[in-house]
Amino acid sequence: MASATTNQGNEWRFVAPININTTTENTVSCVKFDPHEDLFWIGSSTGKVTSLLPTNHFTRYSAFVVSNISGVHSLEPTESLIFTLSDTMLRATTRQGIPVAKFTSPSMTKMAASCHMPGTSTFIMGGFQEKLIHYDFVKEKEIRTTELKASENAIIIRYNGTNTFTADTRGNVFVKNSKNCETIHTLDCHQDQVLDFDVQGNKLITCGVSMNRLKNMDQFIKVYDLRMYKALSPIGMPYLPQFARFMPSYCERVCVTYQTMYNQPGQTATWSNHPAGVKMFDLNSNGNSAEFPIETSLISAFDFSSNKNFIAVGNHCGIVNVFADRDQPQVNENSKETVFAAPPVQPPLSFAIDDTTQTFGSIPLGFSQEPLVSDWPTELTQIVYRRRKPPTEQTNVKSIHYLSQIKNPRINSKLKRHNIVPYFFEQEELIEASNDHGSKEEAPQEMKRIKVSKLYKKRPLIVNQVPARRGNSQDETQETYTWNIIRHVTMQSTHGMNLVANTLVQVAYSLSPIRSIVLRHICTEDSCITCELHFLFTAFSSKIGDNSGMLTNNLAWALARNGVSLKAGGVLSATQQIIKTVIDDVARTDASGSICSKFDRHLRCIRCRGLQQQESVTDHLLKLNYAPVYQASLCQLIEKSLHIGDDSGEIECEDCKQMSRMECKRKVRELSPVLLIDTNASSNGFVEFWRRQLSLFERKPGGNRSSALGTVPESPSEKKNCRFGTDCRNKKTCKFVHGLVDWPAEQTKLLEDVDLPEWAHYIPSRIAAQLCEGIVRLSDVSDLPDYDEPSAVIYELDAMIHAVGNGENDVNWTHPVTLLRESPVISSSWTLINEQLVSRLHDHEARHIDGRWKLPALLAYKKKNFDVKTSEDIISNDLFLAEENLASNGMTSLAVQSLEELPKEKELVGLDAEFIKIKTDLLEFDGKTVQMRAVGRASCVDSTGERIIFDDHVKLTDDVEVVDYLTKFSGIVKADLCPTTSEKYLTTHKRLLLRMHVLIQRGVTFVGHALHNDFTVLNVHVAESQIIDTVTLMRLGTQRMLSLQFLVKEILGETIQMEAHDSVVDARYALKLYRKYLEIKEQGLLGSEMRRIYTILPCPSPNQTSSPLVVSTTRKTPEDTNPADAAPKSV
């Protein structure tokens, strides 16, 4: 129950919860109190509009549907009509739900907001398109369309009587001339998106989202003076503000709805445990305020009545909570009378016998028990069966012993499989079926669309784990990234290249022969793929249980610079390219050839059939070829790939002395312990071949030939929550979920009752290989667990990469996923890794494939009980001392020159890096250009700060283009990174990484400011125990993070970074700041000192563009740990 005292002395009280849900959950998209009549309007995300009577216990007045394909984005009541805005249409309807008019335009594509200009018949409409539309509903035409600037849109529109105000998705508010919509001024309010804003007089208030690696809502209300377009002091809120509106009054009174996006500690994730509230206060005086809490889920709509008696708050679960400040509240001071439907006409009690205006049908009559004149006679209502036609003698009957056989007259029809005898009437001619086309096969039926489980769907980006209130997402399910209960290390898919490459990294790490090769290799070659895998594999042990996922940007760059192109071909082509490039590079570094099969290659001329030459070759990746094959098992395809070599092209025959194509055949001398099978996913007949084979071989329980390809198990997030929650009385029969989903229990269900005989798979789990005189014979022994043939070698399916599509017949492949077999003890269980979602599957579900959404790109078979003991090679310390100045100045490095000078274990070093902004089209599909940060300079000093361990500038490659050198913040200019003009020590990114990994391997402790930002851009993975980040140490609670320049000035009393940043200076002062931190903490003055610092901040705005104090970082110190635990006790 909400209770708060208002300025009239009354109390706000909870009036009623309004549920707009019927059979499905509908999000409340907008609410509006009618300013003309006593009505309350609700719009939903499914295109439905409902009106209620607030003064009559919120009984329903009318309800109608305005769109079947879009939600209701805006409600604008006028005197006679109610206007509703959907994605592509503005519809006018009477308050009783009768359609009057609708307006559509080619300019209306993704509409989001509308504003009725007071005193006129004009609407201004905007949305996610770059246009503003003026529409006159009296003239029923579009009077003006204003083209906005590039990347500018209008998702919120307001009017203050003088100017029009719009907000876009980039955090800007535009002040526009109401006559011609020209921009007068632009206010940069928030870094990412404006959630809500309002204007009254010359004041503007906003609330929104800032971008700090992850999107975070600003926990304050920003205020602007429109006379000077100047930002005033912001107003702090207890939680994250969602809506901010002016309440018209003599003073500037503000009403704010706030809410936290996280559940309260100790509570389950039900719909009502997101703390929220409404706060009303005077803008110039926070003392005169009223506040009350709300029990609700995520808030999606807000409004108050014209006389401020009612406040309504809607949420994403379809519930509207209404509050009032008095016992008899009204919607408006002077409302028009609402038109109600006429009451039903009751039958007259009596009327005159000569009254011709009355009808006898209006007189109700009782049901008579006596027979009526209209009753059918009894003899006409008896059940009579049709007499069977007498049997006729058949001329084409053959008798065998006691059986009689006759030709099926429906042999060429759809009923040929049904035991149906046609019924012929005497007057009809009996036509026997022709047998001319009896041998032809039936045309294949088109495959139906199938729903893809969310276990396999492409995961949304983790830039914002709270669903945006105003977004275009069609998936309203709240996803979670805490499903990694199997403790696998996951990786982030920041670009298209990472999306595909991460799946192969998981497979390579799971196969011990490949993992052993990778961990034994280290070199100084630029863009070495195996080195990048080595760096990732060494960091896996320290990242187990980290749900944030590892970054693999350096691996993506290495793949792009080794010839992998995403500009054409889509996911299938990219997957095949990356598989071949990575496996080829790993095999190149393997001197022993432990993952290669050995062959004798024979070339024979197709003209004279003469044998040309014989040579020994090796192959580490078998590519399937589908060209001349119509139907074959997977074992037969693998045999073909083993024995048929690559096309050698036309060469001169030694016997017939003519240019001729050579037929290549191979004899197997030795099979590799690991068979890596490339399914050749980018070939033309790939999808057609697999669909044809699956229709013959693939089965699952409950299916037949026409429906053999069934559905996959649904994920818990696909189940809808019951609106009654744990209080539901019909939990046993209710089809909805009650309370928190037990994800481990859901995974256990996927592993139960799976060994059914109806399963059949095209991909065998075990194959037996027999080698005799160079010929390999493969057999599927999946169903023979006791198979024991002395001459056969058993290979077990250990890993797979599958391409996942959208489930359509004309499939669109979206991304790959990884499937790994678990330990032999529980070998029936598989692990599905879909980006950062990790789940268990049983063997049948893992091997089940479907041509509409799931086909294999890589199959990895490993010899039974074969394992390689992994031994990691230590990175030599000599690699740190390797000198390679790429600049032409001949300058020697400032780095230490002897191993004795390198820091020891647990020794502190100061580290800082400077970045530049670049753009490239190598990492995304279809050549899409992306901008990112790249390291331009990195510096490290010893614990005293006097000796430089290294200070390197990084040379840029030719495949990137610099957008901005960020000289003001990095101190780097164009000449510093050019080999011909640089006066610095210039090296490669690979050399810098080797120096970093030598220090990590030696166990040093890195001290710096916002170190996680540096490690993210460098793409270096460091254990948390080796990191001391002063940006988290010198922070008060959840307050904003402070810059190194400000902390040094306030704590050390020194001034740095006046002209440009110097990474050596920053590294030294980070060490000094950490020493001072230990000194203050030992004296017990840390809390008071931090409170003092936060009271003297020069700029209260956390916007990075307006204050130099903010540091963008993606890591936060957990609340239950001490940030200094990883640091040594003394310096």
UniProtKB/Swiss-Prot annotation:
Regions annotated as coiled coil: none
Start and end residues of each USP domain: 489-864
Domain of life the protein comes from: Eukaryota
Molecular-function GO terms, alphabetical: nucleic acid binding
Gene this chain is encoded by: panl-2
Lineage: Eukaryota, Metazoa, Ecdysozoa, Nematoda, Chromadorea
Polar residues: compositionally biased ranges: 1104-1115
Positions of region (Disordered): 1104-1131
Pfam families to which the protein is assigned, alphabetical: PAN2_N, RNase_T, UCH_1
Gene Ontology terms: biological process: nuclear-transcribed mRNA poly(A) tail shortening; reproductive process
SMART domains cross-referenced by the UniProt entry: EXOIII
SUPFAM superfamilies in the cross-refs: Ribonuclease H-like, WD40 repeat-like
Designated name of the protein: PolyA-specific ribonuclease subunit panl-2
Domain Exonuclease positions: 909-1074
GO CC aspect terms: P-body; PAN complex
